[in-house]
Amino acid sequence: MSYTIQAQTRTEIGKGSSRRLRHAGKVPAVIYGQGKEPVSIVFDHKDIINIQANADFYTSTLTIVVDGKEVGVRAQAMQRHVFKPLIEHVDFVYA
């Protein structure tokens, strides 16, 4: 199955800006991989909460549209809130 997530590049990095994004219903994330520069991104929580429930989300290649440019990635790690159904951060690896 194919998944597409719309994202924007993050300009503010750090704990405070990440908390502000989470309170606004956004999820901070990073895309990294061998030989490529890491990219900090942000996307809406509602865009990922439903698709991550599918088992093939973790094994298939996802498409993230970052500022109009499509990037193929795989989910590497996901940090969740301790008791709320919230995703706090996602690490993606270039596919």
UniProtKB/Swiss-Prot annotation:
KW Kinase (keyword) present: no
Listed GO CC annotations: cytosolic large ribosomal subunit
InterPro entries the record matches: Rbsml_bL25/Gln-tRNA_synth_N, Ribosomal_bL25/Gln-tRNA_synth, Ribosomal_bL25_long, Ribosomal_bL25_short, Ribosomal_L25_dom, Ribosomal_uL5_bac-type
Keywords assigned: Ribonucleoprotein, Ribosomal protein, RNA-binding, rRNA-binding
Record keyword Transferase present: no
Family: Belongs to the bacterial ribosomal protein bL25 family.
Function as written in the Swiss-Prot or TrEMBL entry: This is one of the proteins that binds to the 5S RNA in the ribosome where it forms part of the central protuberance.
Stored NCBIfam families: bL25_bact_ctc, PRK05943.1
Protein name per Swiss-Prot or TrEMBL: Large ribosomal subunit protein bL25
Organism of origin: Shewanella baltica (strain OS155 / ATCC BAA-1091)
